[in-house]
Amino acid sequence: MNATCTPSLPYDASRLRELAHLLIGTISEFAQAGWTPATSSNFSHRLDEHHVAITVSGRDKRCLREEDIMAVDLDGNAVGHPHTPSAETLLHTQLYRRFPEIGCVLHTHSLTQTVASRVYAGAGHISLKDYELLKAFAGHSTHETTLDVPVFCNTQNMNILAAQVDTLLDKQRMWGYLINGHGMYTWGNTLADARRHLEALEFLLHCELDLLKLRGYL
């Protein structure tokens, strides 16, 4: 009698399961906050030197299961999983390739992020200045600083968008960016770091929009 052989995976399957549960808990909180409407948004965590754990495309972020987190290589190709990764996987993997220290990338679609991306699309960036919460970003120890958040044009061609992000990363340090009419990407060395950057940007963008309303610009 011949035994059925299961092909070995090039990554630690138990580690993928561990990361799946870690991500699902956080994603569920974002979904409850309304930051992942209509199955939008995607999230990832470095699995090992050559692989990333990332959400499967088109899943409702309010009720993810372990099988909704899959592995891809650093070129964005599915590994050991029959499903399709997020359509924007390349925007995740480019960061993991470029920065070996990055451990987590978060992409959300909150109302605040989307409106801010539309308001500041013409300028191409949002300048956040003199906020105490700027100290939430890695490397910032004072409020007396300015953080520029880029706003990129939306496109369905992820190669073009990834190239634009890479070009700007050559010129400035970034903790996140907006895509016009779309949402926001943030990242960090750990999930906690990435989440802190996301929450800080969400709050500061809300502040900027409220200031525009108070001044009669919106």
UniProtKB/Swiss-Prot annotation:
Keywords: Amino-acid biosynthesis, Lyase, Metal-binding, Methionine biosynthesis, Zinc. It catalyses: 5-(methylsulfanyl)-D-ribulose 1-phosphate = 5-methylsulfanyl-2,3-dioxopentyl phosphate + H2O. Its cofactor is Zn(2+). Pfam families: Aldolase_II (PF00596). SMART domains: Aldolase_II. GO terms for cellular component: cytoplasm. The keyword Zinc applies. Pathway: Amino-acid biosynthesis; L-methionine biosynthesis via salvage pathway; L-methionine from S-methyl-5-thio-alpha-D-ribose 1-phosphate: step 2/6. One of its GO terms (molecular function) is methylthioribulose 1-phosphate dehydratase activity. Binds 1 zinc ion per subunit. GO terms for biological process: L-methionine salvage from methylthioadenosine; monosaccharide metabolic process. Zn(2+) binds at residues 107, 109. InterPro entries: Aldolase_II/adducin_N, Aldolase_II/adducin_N_sf, MethylthioRu-1-P_deHdtase_MtnB. Catalyzes the dehydration of methylthioribulose-1-phosphate (MTRu-1-P) into 2,3-diketo-5-methylthiopentyl-1-phosphate (DK-MTP-1-P). HAMAP family: Salvage_MtnB. Belongs to the aldolase class II family. MtnB subfamily. NCBIfam families: PRK09220.1, salvage_mtnB. This is Methylthioribulose-1-phosphate dehydratase.
